[in-house]
């Protein structure tokens, strides 16, 4: 294909918005043709039995799509919209409400599945956890962070596991001189795949640390607990500091027979399936027919993400997605004149949805 337009590339959720738009517009059109509520038509067509095998390899393992729809409808007072619409019309305004339900395939994998579709690489992820003699932890990951907050979330994972301050955890990524081979950050896979590789490495580190502690404290491995920066024997007052166990691993003066010195482990993780978050978004707008001005009255986002590691980062991701969607729907466009000249070549002409334009939205 030859074109004189400027090159473009995906910046988030490549292909998914277009596919979702098509499906949701079909649902809206069908509801109007059938004379039924768009919400109830969606509800009647939700998948309710799991696991659900799709025609394209993937199997939905679990989901409660009615819950997110009901939550969004309640938060937006969906049933009260006709009254609000009538009130707007009394002022000469036009008011509309729209909803969109989605299911997303995240954590792109497993390698065998994508290989059958023609992928030239495996889609596992790797990690290495290095515990230093003083008890600080260094995590090397193939999942690169470019705004997703890996440094915070990954450090929080280690902090919660061993009871260490996050300042004692260093996340290393993006340096090919240090980090072992990884499959990268895309397809919403850093948490589901990248963090799972870290967890597998942490499991090995914890198991070895407990063996060392059990040997030093003359206790059973099954009785060893690690919490709050201490390694203790359950039901007793016998304990060691986390740093003491780490130092013992490296001095190697008193290790179990046959154990190698050090406290460093690596792991690979190749998931058996994708993960499938889902949700429902409802937007209510008011339009001034005289000027064309659009006001977003409210925007409700109800998402089912499963277990959330850091709610603040996840909420920020949702806010960013809302801003991008609003910008794409109302403002942003690459416009060319009849001679093929790009007329939206600067921020003076290409409108972006900015933080000062964003209002308060509901998120749950």
What are the roles of these predicted feature ranges?
Residues 1-67, 74-355:
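Cofactor-binding beta-sheet edge motifs in enzyme active sites
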Residues 353-364:
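Single conserved hydrophobic/aromatic residue that forms the stacking wall/gate
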């Amino acid at each position: 294909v030859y074109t004189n337009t400027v090159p473009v590339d995906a910046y988030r959720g490549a292909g998914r918005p277009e596919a979702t738009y098509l499906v949701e517009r079909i649902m809206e059109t069908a509801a109007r043709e059938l004379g039924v509520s768009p919400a109830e038509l969606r509800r009647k067509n939700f998948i309710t039995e799991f696991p659900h095998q799709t025609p394209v390899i993937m199997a939905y393992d679990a989901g409660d799509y009615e819950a997110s729809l009901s939550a969004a409808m309640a938060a937006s007072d969906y049933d009260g919209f006709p009254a609000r619409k009538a009130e707007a019309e009394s002022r000469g305004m036009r008011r509309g409400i729209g909803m969109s339900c989605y299911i997303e395939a995240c954590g792109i994998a497993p390698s065998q599945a994508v290989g059958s579709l023609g992928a030239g690489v495996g889609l596992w992820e790797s990690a290495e956890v290095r515990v230093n003699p003083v008890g600080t932890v260094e995590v090397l990951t193939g999942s690169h962070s470019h705004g997703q907050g890996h440094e915070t979330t990954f450090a929080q994972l280690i902090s919660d596991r061993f009871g260490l301050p996050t300042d004692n955890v260093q996340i290393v990524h993006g340096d090919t001189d240090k980090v072992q081979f990884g499959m990268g950050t895309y397809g919403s896979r850093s948490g589901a795949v990248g963090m799972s590789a870290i967890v597998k490495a942490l499991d090995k580190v914890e198991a070895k640390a407990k063996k060392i502690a059990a040997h030093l404290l003359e206790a059973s491995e099954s009785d060893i607990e690690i919490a709050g920066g201490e390694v203790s024997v359950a039901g007793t007052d016998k304990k060691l500091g986390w740093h003491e166990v780490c130092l013992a691993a490296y001095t190697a003066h008193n290790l179990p027979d046959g154990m190698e010195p050090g406290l460093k482990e690596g792991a690979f993780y190749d998931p058996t399936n994708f993960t499938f978050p889902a949700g429902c978004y409802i937007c209510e707008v008011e339009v001034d027919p005289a000027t064309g001005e659009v006001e977003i009255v409210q925007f409700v986002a109800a998402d089912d993400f499963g277990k959330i590691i850091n709610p603040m980062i996840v909420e920020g991701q949702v806010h960013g997605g809302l801003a991008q969607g609003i910008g794409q729907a109302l403002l942003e466009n690459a416009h060319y004149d009849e001679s093929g000249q790009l007329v939206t070549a600067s921020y003076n002409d290409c409108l972006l949805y900015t933080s000062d334009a964003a209002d308060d939205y509901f998120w749950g």
